[in-house]
Amino acid sequence: MSKKRGLSVEEKRTRMMEIFFETKDVFQLKDLEKIAPKEKGITSMSVKEILQSLVDDGMVDSERIGTSNYFWAFPSKALHARKRKLETLEAQFTEVKQKKESLQQCVDKAKVGRQDTEERSKLVEELASLRHRKEELCADLEKYKECDPDVVEEIRQSNKVAKDAVNRWTDNIFAVKSWAKKKFGFEERQIDKNFGIPEDFDYID
């Protein structure tokens, strides 16, 4: 018999938010350490860490009154956090797109007189697809004028799709860099320097 898989960090965060949304109540840490394992399957030892991560991300509010800390969260709070996350993803998207376009210009110059339109066409299609997804995310945001507990799952899914889209662009940039190095002898350090690609440029976790 296979061993039951434990909850991921994201699943724990989602279930913790469900406690707040379903009860619309204010809790102390000790209360959540009792409720979370029983109702949501979150181990009591991980409650504090998960709760703090939600506070750090602006999903849960916290206030110290006397000697005790109190925690609460409402759907409208999640909506604002989602807006900030979307803005962050859009900024990352714009930055990646600009770097991609700069690299594409470099490759286009190097390909003068060469027939290599298939790869270029694929990159153009990917750009159109990602632009369309960005428009969908913005339109989806408008639908959440009134939130309900389902917003937690919606936030997780939308952010995952947007993050995957940005990471696909990161894949494209790495692919173009690799292609340029192999075909034209460009050095990676030179490409990064010429087009302002930071040393820590990488995928979004």
Curated annotation (Swiss-Prot):
Keywords associated with the record: Coiled coil, DNA recombination, Meiosis, Nucleus
Gene Ontology CC, one term: nucleus
Disulfide partners: none
InterPro entries named among the record's database cross-references: LZ3wCH, Mnd1, Mnd1_HTH
Localization in the cell: Nucleus
Underlying gene: mnd1
Residues that span the membrane, as ranges: none
Keyword Transport: no
Protein name: Meiotic nuclear division protein 1 homolog
Stated family: Belongs to the MND1 family.
Higher taxonomy: Eukaryota, Metazoa, Chordata, Craniata, Vertebrata
Ribonucleoprotein keyword on record: no
